[in-house]
């Protein structure tokens, strides 16, 4: 309590800086890898990807604002355990932010796509273990997270393999690929819109009071997907499409999948912004709340007005200044991508997110996407995969939790020494 009463304003300022650093890391790594397939496949340029990501990530982040004050969303520890030592929780959140930002910065410099959520969970584990003991951590939750490293990439890889194989059989390996793309394209579009609507309503819009039942979500998604399917049925048959496409070439076919891929990338960026923004501003909100309440730990309350813009700014700066490093790894480092291959990977990721949301399986979008890209590579043969890059990526996943914990412990001791 003494630290909060004496240094409350300093804690808020320092946490704001650390929160910006964490948001910077999310923008440079998490957001960048989600747009990597679109850039690597040639669907859009890196500059266009940055603009699209900023628009949809920011939109998702602002819609998430009302729920972010639930701070430690991971469920790894319960804040109530710090009710008698709020100053320890405040320093712990400071440590968590800096540690997570530091690991994301290092991973980005190395070109490793890692999970921001897993990074911050590792950091929370680190400071919790040295302050209130290992028993305070919900280790079953950690077991589920570790299990997801294997389960979700495999699911996404299998789905991506199946989607890619279907496009080859129905479209690319036929005598008239463009005609078949016009024939089957609307069906791919309808299925894509159906899944993306579910992702948006269940993941992206759950923070704005849109409490739809599963049946309502399915009905609305089906209706929108049917509208989309009919629209693109006429679009692919129209002169606008046929004149812009170069008939008889695979480039014209790939244009169909470019549209699908762009839709998927926008929807996933929106869902990511509405959920993962809490990784940066959740701990920041916790410290501000503790200071404003004079040391009391509250579970709800209004979000201070400047926190969301700070998080959005940090994500934007990180994406613009360092985003292309991870984009390159995801977009071209693992395997060569075309719009059809990139769509298969992005769509498989979206489908896996839907499955995980329905089953409660903890999921990293980063790891899911990488698993989907691996599935595409396997469909083309093992020689199509860059095994060195894959080895480095998997190693970085394994290191992420302990790295977050290690940095958090170091920073916590430094901060405690300074403020004591």
Swiss-Prot record:
Belongs to the inorganic phosphate transporter (PiT) (TC 2.A.20) family. Potential transporter for phosphate. It is found in: Cell inner membrane. The lineage of its organism: Bacteria, Pseudomonadati, Pseudomonadota, Gammaproteobacteria, Pasteurellales. It holds the Pfam family PHO4. It is a multi-pass membrane protein. Keywords: Cell inner membrane, Cell membrane, Membrane, Phosphate transport, Transmembrane, Transmembrane helix, Transport. One of its GO terms (molecular function) is phosphate transmembrane transporter activity. The chain crosses the membrane at residues 8-28, 49-69, 88-108, 112-132, 145-165, 185-205, 216-236, 250-270, 300-320, 343-363, 370-390, 393-413. It comes from Haemophilus influenzae (strain ATCC 51907 / DSM 11121 / KW20 / Rd). GO terms for cellular component: plasma membrane. This is Putative phosphate permease HI_1604. One of its GO terms (biological process) is phosphate ion transmembrane transport.
């Amino acid at each position: 309590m003494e630290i909060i009463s004496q240094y409350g304003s300093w804690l808020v300022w320092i946490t704001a800086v650390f929160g910006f650093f964490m948001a910077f890391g999310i923008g440079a790594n998490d957001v960048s890898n989600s747009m990597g397939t679109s850039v690597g496949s040639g669907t859009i340029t890196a500059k266009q990807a940055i603009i699209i990501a900023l628009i949809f990530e920011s939109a998702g982040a602002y819609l998430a604002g009302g729920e972010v004050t639930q701070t430690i969303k991971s469920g790894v520890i319960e804040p109530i355990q710090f009710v008698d030592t709020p100053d320890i929780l405040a320093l712990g959140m400071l440590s968590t932010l800096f540690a997570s930002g530091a690991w994301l910065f290092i991973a980005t410099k190395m070109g490793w796509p890692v999970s921001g959520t897993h990074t911050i969970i590792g950091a929370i584990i680190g400071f919790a273990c040295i302050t209130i003991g290992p028993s305070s951590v919900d280790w079953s939750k950690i077991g589920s997270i570790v299990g997801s490293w294997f389960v979700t990439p495999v699911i996404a890889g299998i789905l991506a393999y199946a989607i890619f194989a279907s496009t080859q059989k129905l479209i690319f390996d036929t005598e008239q690929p463009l005609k078949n793309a016009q024939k089957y394209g609307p069906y791919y579009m309808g299925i894509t819109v159906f899944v993306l609507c579910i992702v948006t309503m269940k993941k992206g819009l759950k923070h704005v009071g849109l409490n739809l039942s599963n049946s309502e979500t399915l009905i609305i998604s089906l209706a929108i997907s049917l509208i989309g399917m009919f629209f693109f049925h006429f679009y692919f048959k129209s002169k606008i499409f046929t004149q812009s496409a170069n008939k008889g070439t695979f480039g014209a076919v790939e244009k169909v999948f470019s549209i699908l891929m762009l839709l998927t990338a926008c929807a996933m960026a929106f869902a990511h912004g509405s959920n993962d923004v809490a990784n940066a501003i959740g701990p920041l909100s916790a410290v501000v709340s503790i200071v404003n309440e004079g040391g009391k730990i509250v579970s709800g309350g209004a979000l201070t007005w400047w926190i969301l813009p700070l998080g959005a700014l940090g994500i934007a700066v990180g994406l613009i200044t360092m985003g292309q490093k991870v984009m390159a790894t995801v977009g071209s480092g693992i395997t060569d991508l075309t719009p059809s291959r990139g769509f298969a990977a992005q769509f498989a990721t979206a489908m896996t997110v839907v499955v995980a949301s329905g089953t409660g399986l903890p999921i990293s979008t980063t790891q899911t996407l990488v698993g989907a890209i691996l599935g595409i590579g396997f469909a083309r043969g093992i020689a199509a995969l860059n095994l060195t890059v894959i080895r480095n990526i998997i190693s970085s996943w394994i290191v992420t939790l302990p790295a977050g914990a290690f940095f958090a412990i170091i920073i916590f001791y430094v901060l405690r020494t300074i403020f004591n």
